[in-house]
Amino acid sequence: MRGHKTKWMRTLAVAASLALVATACGGDDDGGDDATDDAATEASTDDGGDDGGGEASGLLAELQEAGSITVGIANEVPYGYEDESGNATGEAPEVARAVLSGLGIDEVNAEVVDFGALISGLQAGQFDMIAAGMYINAERAEQILFSDPDYCIGEAFAVPEGNPLGLSDFQSVVDTPEATIAILSGAVEEGYAEIAGVPSDQIELYGDVNAQYDDLDAGRVDAVTGTSLTVLTQVNARDGIESTESFFPLDENGEEILGCGGFGFRNDNQEFRDAFNDQLNTMQDNGELIDIITGFGFAAEDVERAQELTVADLTG
């Protein structure tokens, strides 16, 4: 568990704190996932929040003074969506509420955008952070900062009942030239399909999660890919479709890719990210988040996997 790893890393962080000060303060101008950002991330993840007791500044101070924040979501159940009353809920917004409350920010509002517009919307200042269960990877970490993960989960396909084409993973799509698969634009599944060699004419890209499943219902696509939990949520809400078994996609070297989600921040808001991360880690180590996350259908092991990892582990 990361709780043990955290204690070990805290010892290193204290010993190296003077050497890391300049690195941590200057590591965000280019947004790159380089050694500077990794060092800053490790310091923020593992120093237990001991930043000398100084007052917050920048965006964090503004949010604390206002007591409210706007987060970006993509209306994807169960990760981040609006309920029937128009209130933001889901795994990520509810975890964010709990963590932000510990930072003195009690009101969480949401802006709904297409998944592929989350990063650009954050960068443009449309909202203050991303709380959409976004997977952490090196490509995205070149554009924004991430927290440590709060869940890790596999992939699955939604297919018509009986799975008439026998689809089970991306390689099975390659092996079935007549199959067309729906993928959420900007999601990691685009990359998974590319690595597997799925031809572009077998892929339909969508900006909206529900539209993918509407087209599956109508027979316009043969499968929808997504996290196993997204697929299961949709399958349980619709007639005539089923989920394949969960699987982990493969990278260029044939190694399984572990999909882990976290929270996104602008590159110039490292102080905010660091404070959020410290509070997140504390609540993970204390077991305060597991009921929130499993309440949205995640398994306990999905939460426990994430506790063993940091953002640096996922971005290289």
Where are these regions (language model features)?
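C-terminal motif of bacterial Sec signal peptides marking the signal peptidase cleavage site
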Residues: 20-24
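Extended ligand-binding regions for polar small-molecule ligands
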Residues: 26, 93-102, 163, 187, ...
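Short, low-complexity, disordered segments immediately C-terminal to signal peptides
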Residues: 26-58
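Extracytoplasmic small-molecule ligand-binding "clamshell" domains
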Residues: 54-132
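Bilobed "Venus flytrap"/periplasmic-binding protein-like clamshell domains
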Residues: 70-78, 88-103, 155-213, 223, ...
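Acidic, polar ligand-binding/catalytic clefts
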Residues: 97, 108-172
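A ligand-binding cleft/hinge motif common to bilobed small-molecule-binding domains
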Residues: 134-142, 192-195, 222-257
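Periplasmic-binding protein-like
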Residues: 152-156, 237-277, 300-316
